Amino acid sequence: MFQDNPLLAQLKQQLHSQTPRAEGVVKATEKGFGFLEVDAQKSYFIPPPQMKKVMHGDRIVAVIHTEKERESAEPEELIEPFLTRFVGKVQGKNDRLSIVPDHPLLKDAIPCRAARGVQHEFKEGDWAVAEMRRHPLKGDRSFYADLTQYITFADDHFVPWWVTLARHNLEKEAPNGVATEMLDEGLERQDLTALNFVTIDSASTEDMDDALYAEELADGRLQLTVAIADPTAWIAEGSKLDNAAKIRAFTNYLPGFNIPMLPRELSDDLCSLRANEVRPALACRMIISADGTIDDDIAFFAATIESKAKLAYDNVSDWLENNGTWQPDNEGIAQQIRLLHRICLSRSEWRHHHALVFKDRPDYRFVLGEKGEVLDIVAEPRRIANRIVEESMIAANLCAARVLRDKLGFGIYNVHTGFDPANADALAALLKTHGLHVDAEEVLTLEGFCKLRRELDAQPSGFLDSRIRRFQSFAEISTEPGPHFGLGLEAYATWTSPIRKYGDMINHRLLKAVIKGEAIARPQEDITQQMAERRRLNRMAERDVGDWLYARFLNDKAGTNTRFAAEIIDVSRGGMRVRLVDNGAIAFIPAPFLHAVHDELVCSQENGTVQIKGETVYKVTDVIDVTIAEVRMETRSIIARPAA
């Protein structure tokens, strides 16, 4: 009798509309209960039984109940699940399989089975890719997943690499394909094979992109010719190889090995500017005045070159610093190193005054054994030879940016607009509290940004610099010419790494059109989006593999008194993040390790400081001594504590 009662339906509807609800993101805890985080200020308690319906990270709508003045959330509707495609470890065997997602806050095993078409017979400990199929808030009884791809077995030494690449859905190997002959591009190539071009790279590099040649002109000015490997002489636009490179967008450099954008036959051989091998190249010739200014008379042209020496950064740096036993093979090579050194110094001086120069940070290199074990982690400081190459590449990219802008009006540009205009007033207010006065309007211009950066670089510590970083915008890839505030340049377009960056291949094709005086279409916007997305994924993959290897490397230091110098890089409510100076590992120091009495401790992310009893004890950029308290292998996290 009540079934179709309109009054009852109306009452139900009324009750439903009067019940308070909230939308937010589920945050799990290790204790079984959770919270519905609505915004930074408001969250609701989710009791353990209700947590069984949801997963950490799910965006949901929940009904809010109030009992004895305590509010709690009952999940009602799923807006967006946290897990869709994920990687994890398989448990059980045969017909009763489950998978534990590889995520620090997801501990529960999810029942699963192999998807149709997946041949592998899964067993305990296998790593797999899975896709969620059922969710309790979707009307299903429980969570359920399909195993869509086998990654590797439990004890594979190379788990960090294979699991990370599968997690980010990235390629595991070089693309297939061969280039049999060079294309007829209708380009006249200048024969520069007699000139003493040299390459300077790491000793182990095989994919040499760039070769340099310098000479002194009669009036004392220096002429630099930058010759760049020419993969577009082999790869036609729209071909199979070109499309594969477009998808990859970059060579993926991971600790221990790389996954190239082009087939290795091209990247490490046919295109690589190997010593004593004749190679096609795209070249740029520029004249540099004594004060480091690049003259307007810039020439781009196609060439044939033959590198006369494969030089290594450390050898060249040692020789210039009068250290070590290494000597150039002959006076011609020695003369090249001297001239390139002079160009480096004058360009560096010019950039100090007219643009911006990054502070040098060391590169950290993992030394790996046959089985992927970490034998050592070496900090490699950026030395004078690195800077010679860097200054030459920045100069060449600046030339390309100008030529593409003036001749075509488009290209693949790296654009960085400095500070987000919405943050300008807050930035000026923050700087004022530290005694620096800037105009909120002026700081949004390239000149104003450079002026502020130089003032910050002159500060005794990097503390203030670290505080304003959150106000900065991100660098972008754009087809429209625009300034690069981070480099302090009016425009910047890279073309010097076409073996490893697809955007540089595009700029090669555009520059060749300029050389031939031909019209060419503007690159599609979706290409810049693909490049930005791939750059993000490659960086995450490099970080993930690094975290795994750091955890392996420091595992035997946990609980010992071994001290490490560590720079504080971030403060949050829960503690501090530090970077170990000698090897680059990131570790977390929980707040209770900083001070035992909770009420006397204030960790402020806003100020980048830790105060104990009102006194600032730690701040971002401080370097302190720490010991390793614990290494959690399952989450690849390193927990440190200040050394006693």
Curated annotation (Swiss-Prot):
Q: What is its EC number?
A: 3.1.13.1
**GO MF terms held by the record:** exoribonuclease II activity; RNA binding
Q: Which subcellular locations apply to this protein?
A: Cytoplasm
Which keywords belong to this entry? Cytoplasm, Exonuclease, Hydrolase, Nuclease, RNA-binding
Which family is annotated?
A: Belongs to the RNR ribonuclease family. RNase II subfamily.
Q: Which GO terms describe its biological process?
A: mRNA catabolic process
- In Swiss-Prot or TrEMBL terms, this protein is called Exoribonuclease 2
Spell out the GO cellular component terms annotated for this protein, sorted alphabetically and separated by semicolons. Answer: cytosol
- Per the UniProt record, the source organism is Salmonella gallinarum (strain 287/91 / NCTC 13346)
Domain RNB as annotated: residue spans = 189-516
UniProt key word Cytoplasm: yes
S1 motif domain spans which residues? 561-643
Q: Which PANTHER family match?
A: EXORIBONUCLEASE 2, RIBONUCLEASE
Kindly give the InterPro entries that the UniProt entry links to this protein: CSD, NA-bd_OB-fold, RNase_B_OB_dom, RNase_II, RNase_II/R, RNase_II/R_CS, RNase_II/RNase_R, RNR_Ribonuclease
Please give the superkingdom of this protein's source. Bacteria
Gene3D superfamilies named in the record: 2.40.50.640, Nucleic acid-binding proteins
Quote the catalytic activity from the record: Exonucleolytic cleavage in the 3'- to 5'-direction to yield nucleoside 5'-phosphates
The enzyme's first-digit EC class, named in words, is hydrolase
Biological role: Involved in mRNA degradation. Hydrolyzes single-stranded polyribonucleotides processively in the 3' to 5' direction.
